[in-house]
Design a protein with these regions (language model features):
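Binuclear metal-dependent hydrolase catalytic cores
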Residues: 1-244, 309-337
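Binuclear metal-ion centers of metallo-dependent hydrolases, dominated by the metallo-beta-lactamase
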Residues: 184, 196, 250-337
Length: 337
């Protein structure tokens, strides 16, 4: 598939505790403005006919219900922290409705943590009722997502669990070992990181387990490497939208991937310098350097004022500092395209 058009819905724009915070009586946590009610950070991306989720935190169930989601082509995980992975058990509902395993794309260290945190998912023979996942190991290289990438239909067998239905009608267990659940990418062809490559010209990773489809059934995703304190994490570029959360620094080599954006999302946790997140001033500096048409702040905490006040403050700061981007706070339910 070609073209830059993508549509992103902010499902959650709050910190790891969400907003309001349990027990807090500050003005933001008591606000009646729905824009001050923030689920844990997550986004739903509709891109060239595919529906892609970025992160599945503890609010995943309510986020899916709020958007009426019945199908996901892929779940991309930025990193391994619970506010980004804590809702993955709830893909069971989509397994049942969609009759497909959830296609999850994550780095190797994230996969290793998922195995520790969800041991019943990786127990063999499979535990009846456990969610069905297919995991694809990625890194900072571009990779391909294909629509309905698995042709294997899930069938629920009472008191036994999910099986795959083969073309001849035979039912077989979904996985007999860990190897059956993991698809690692082959080596990608080396390419210069340039504006041209950021638009999709370089050779992406292709996963062996993906069913063969036409070019009209696939998109190339461009990961953005960053650090969350010392933890390597990923953001993602979808056409002319880049979604970045939970970063405190971006390597110089990654900025070429961020050229020519219409929309940029950046995490902003507080006014002050933070060990694992961008401060407000760091975010403004990045917006001015990258110069997207619009910059949206997410992963917001209750340390910022209520939405209306914060938006006016951002307008003033951008005007005073001559920031070359329109910077606004995102809020749950906001749609950009």
């Amino acid at each position: 598939m070609t073209g830059a058009g993508a549509r992103l819905t902010f499902l959650g724009t709050g910190t790891s505790q969400g907003v309001p915070i349990i027990g807090c009586q500050c003005e933001v946590c008591r606000s009646k403005d729905t824009r001050d009610k923030r689920f844990r950070a997550s986004a739903l991306v509709e891109y060239q006919g595919l529906t892609i989720l970025v992160d599945a935190g503890p609010d995943f169930r309510m986020q899916m219900l709020g958007q009426g989601v019945r199908h996901l082509d892929a779940i991309l995980l930025t990193h391994n922290h619970k506010d980004h992975t804590g809702g993955l058990d709830d893909v069971r509902s989509l397994n049942y409705i969609d009759r497909r395993a959830a296609e999850i794309y994550c780095e190797k260290n994230v996969l290793e943590d998922l195995i520790r945190e969800y041991p019943y998912v990786f127990k063999f023979p499979k535990y009846p009722g456990a969610p069905e996942w297919m995991l694809h190991v990625i890194d900072e290289r571009p990779f391909i997502i294909r629509k309905d990438s698995s042709d294997k239909e899930l069938v629920w067998v009472h008191d036994v669990g999910y099986h795959y239905r083969l073309p001849n009608g035979q039912l077989v267990p979904t996985a007999r070992s860990l190897d059956d659940m993991i698809d690692e990418a082959p080596e990608a062809v080396a390419a210069d990181v340039s504006l041209q490559s950021a638009k999709g010209a370089w050779a992406p990773c292709v996963f062996s387990g993906l069913a063969a489809k036409t070019d009209e059934d696939q998109v190339t995703i461009i990961p953005i490497r960053g650090l969350h304190d010392k933890l390597p994490v990923l953001g993602f570029r979808f056409g002319d939208i880049a979604y970045i959360t939970d970063m405190s620094s971006i390597p110089e080599s990654e900025f070429a991937k961020l050229e020519g954006l219409k929309h940029l999302t950046l995490n902003t946790v507080s006014y002050n310098t933070h060990h694992s997140h961008f401060s407000l001033q760091e975010t403004l500096d990045l917006a001015d350097r990258i110069r997207p048409e619009h910059t949206w702040l997410t992963h917001l905490s209750h340390s910022f004022p209520v939405h209306e006040t914060f938006q006016k403050e951002l307008e003033r700061m951008c005007q005073e500092q001559h920031i070359h981007s329109i910077v606004r706070p995102a809020y749950d339910g906001l749609v950009i395209e």
